[in-house]
Amino acid sequence: MRLLVLNANTSEFVTRRVADAVRAMASPGTEIVEATGSFGGRVIGTWTEMAIGEHAAVELMARHAPGCDAVLVAVSWDTGLRAGRELLPIPVVAMTEAALLTARQLGGRFGFVTFDARSMALYRTLIEGHGFGARLAAWRVVDSRAVYTPEGALAVDAQVADAINDMAERDGIEVAVISGAVMAGAGPRLQPRCVVPVVEGMAAAFRQAEALVRLGAAKARTGAFAAPAGRESTGIGDALAAALRGDGGGKG
């Protein structure tokens, strides 16, 4: 099995952190390849950066997905998810949707932890778009830019655990979801400190991608996620232009 870890922002260290965390979870025989955006924000955190990231994501998918069995979107905004599911003949799994689906299996009301006060309104829109708005019972912001540095994720563990336990006590959450690809692999570190199940999105996405590949999940041939064909374009990468014409992209 060959899985593509795709990071639509331009922070190489985030891609490496996610890829290393996924490799540590991977079953024998599973190969992890990685790709990072060549343009756009260092960290995606605004509507404008998200719009740029959508373009970066589909360019990366068109170039790097051929030969892979599934794509893992390593951005907690699930950047390029719907476009990827349309464009590619292989499963595309994104970390926040995967975390929400997992949280639903572990409890009812969930809490959400993020690392930028501005981002919570954007995450609420994402959560509602995935159909989980009614289950969002609480959120907390651990307002630290340190988490976005190569050394910073470990430094916020105590604050994240405190935030989760506070939501459990004050708001009655039954599950906690951690945002941010930079927190990939944090679940086992945090769980012993927390009184409710902790779901880290990349772990959830990886396991779901593995399962979809093993299930032999098929590509829709009709409807909104059928592959595009005959779409002409200008000013985009050759691989993406070919995919829009119906000339390639992923395993068929």
Model-derived regions: residue spans:
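Short, acidic/small-residue loops that bind anionic groups at enzyme active sites
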Residues: 85-106, 189-209
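Short, glycine-/small-residue-rich phosphate/pyrophosphate-handling segment
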Residues: 13, 104-141, 154, 211-250
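Glycine-rich, highly charged phosphate/nucleotide-binding loops
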Residues: 46-66, 155-163
